[in-house]
C-alpha cells in the first residue's frame, strides 16, 4: 500500500513539474511603472545593505563635490514609528515587567511559607534532567530570591 501511494505521489509530482501554465490574457498590458519597478528590483545597487534615500536629489547632493550645501547622510529623514507609539510600548513593557516581578515575589513568598527550598524545588521540577527552559529560569530566580531573602533576614 505504501509503495502504491509513493508511486502515485511521484507520478503527480512529475506531471505537475512538467506542465506549463498559460495565461488567459494574451495582451498583458505592462505599464512603464511596472517595468520601472521590476528594473529597480533587479538593479545591482538595490540590495538590503545599501542606504536608501527618500529624496532623489539628496543622493545627487551627496555625490557632487561642487555643491557645498550637500545633505549629510545622517540628516536623511527616515520613516520611523512616532515617539508617542514608542513611549506607549515602553510603558506597556515596563508595566508588564513590574506586574511579572510582583507576581514572582508573591509566588516566592508563598513557596517560602510552605517550606519550599531550592533543593526541593529542583527535585519537583526535575532540574538537571528533562526540565523545560522556563522551569530552569524559575528555579534560578527562586534560588536567587531565596538566598537574598535568607541572607537579609539573618543580618
From Swiss-Prot:
Keywords for the protein's UniProt record, in alphabetical order: Host cell membrane, Host membrane, Membrane, Secreted, Signal, Virulence
GO CC annotations on file: extracellular region; host cell endomembrane system; host cell plasma membrane; membrane
Annotated segments matching region RABA-binding domain: 105-155
Positions of short motif RxLR-dEER: 52-78
Iron in keyword set: no
Pfam families xref list: RXLR
Signal peptide: 1-21
Secreted is among the record's keywords: yes
Quaternary structure and partners: Interacts with Arabidopsis thaliana RABA GTPases including RABA1a, RABA1b, RABA1c, RABA1d, RABA1f, RABA2a, RABA2c, RABA2d, RABA4a, RABA4b and RABA4c.
Similarity section: Belongs to the RxLR effector family.
Name of the protein in question: RxLR effector protein 24
Species this chain originates from: Phytophthora brassicae
Gene transcribed to yield this protein: RxLR24
Amino acid at each position: 500500500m505504501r509503495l502504491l501511494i509513493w508511486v502515485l505521489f511521484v507520478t503527480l509530482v512529475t506531471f505537475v513539474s512538467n506542465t506549463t501554465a498559460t495565461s488567459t490574457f494574451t495582451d498583458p498590458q505592462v505599464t512603464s511603472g511596472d517595468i520601472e519597478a521590476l528594473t529597480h528590483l533587479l538593479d545591482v545597487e538595490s540590495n538590503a545593505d545599501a542606504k536608501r534615500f527618500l529624496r532623489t536629489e539628496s543622493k545627487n547632493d551627496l555625490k557632487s563635490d561642487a555643491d557645498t550645501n550637500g545633505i549629510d547622510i545622517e540628516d536623511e529623514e527616515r520613516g520611523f514609528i512616532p515617539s508617542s507609539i514608542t513611549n506607549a510600548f515602553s510603558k506597556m513593557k515596563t508595566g508588564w515587567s513590574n506586574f511579572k516581578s510582583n507576581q514572582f515575589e508573591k509566588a516566592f513568598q508563598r513557596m517560602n511559607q510552605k517550606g519550599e527550598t531550592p533543593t526541593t524545588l529542583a527535585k519537583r521540577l526535575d532540574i538537571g534532567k528533562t526540565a523545560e527552559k522556563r522551569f530552569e529560569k524559575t528555579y534560578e530566580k527562586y534560588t536567587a530570591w531565596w538566598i537574598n531573602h535568607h541572607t537579609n533576614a539573618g543580618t
